[in-house]
């Protein structure tokens, strides 16, 4: 599993590096936020969802290609968007040994700023996940199915 996790992390790193550069070109503060999101996303986790997806794909297709690596990166971005919002809702101080985004920015600015920024930051990760899925190179009909599932998840959670 570690071998596949590293391959996924390489793709995730490449995607986030490009996005961080673009964000920094736009504004230094936004670039810093993207850097913090990159650090948050790379805190050591199991990457079970993305690794399972990669292994299932390899089992059916016999190989790992760029398309599935983009999808796996999207899965990680999506998962971390949920975790970031969960940290805010639960008012967690730490996630995997590091400060949560809302606490980090609350300490630097104020509570309202940190909380608001965390909502936007989670949404940024969600948007990056959608971008990774959309640009994966899979057929449009498959991408639409995946994006429909992603949109349905928050609705189901809200009904719990």
Which functions belong to the PLM regions below?
Residues 1-21:
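N-terminal amphipathic/basic leader segments beginning at the initiator methionine
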Residues 21-29:
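Membrane-interface helix-loop junction between the first two transmembrane segments
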Residues 29-160:
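Mg2+-dependent prenyl diphosphate-binding active-site environment of isoprenoid biosynthetic enzymes
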């Amino acid at each position: 599993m570690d071998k596949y996790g590293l391959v996924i992390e390489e793709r995730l790193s490449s995607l986030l590096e490009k996005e961080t550069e673009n964000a920094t070109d736009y504004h230094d503060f936004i670039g810093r936020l993207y850097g913090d999101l990159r650090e948050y996303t790379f805190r050591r986790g199991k990457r079970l969802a993305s690794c399972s997806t990669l292994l299932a794909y390899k089992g059916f297709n016999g190989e790992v290609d760029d398309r599935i690596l983009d999808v796996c990166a999207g899965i990680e971005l999506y998962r971390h968007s949920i975790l970031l919002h969960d940290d805010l809702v639960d008012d967690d101080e730490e996630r995997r040994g590091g400060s949560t985004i809302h606490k980090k920015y609350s300490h630097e600015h104020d509570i309202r700023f940190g909380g608001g920024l965390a909502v936007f930051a989670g949404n940024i990760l969600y948007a990056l996940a959608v971008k990774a899925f959309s640009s994966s190179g899979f057929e449009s009909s498959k991408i639409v199915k995946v994006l429909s599932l992603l949109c349905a998840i928050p609705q189901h959670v809200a009904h719990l």
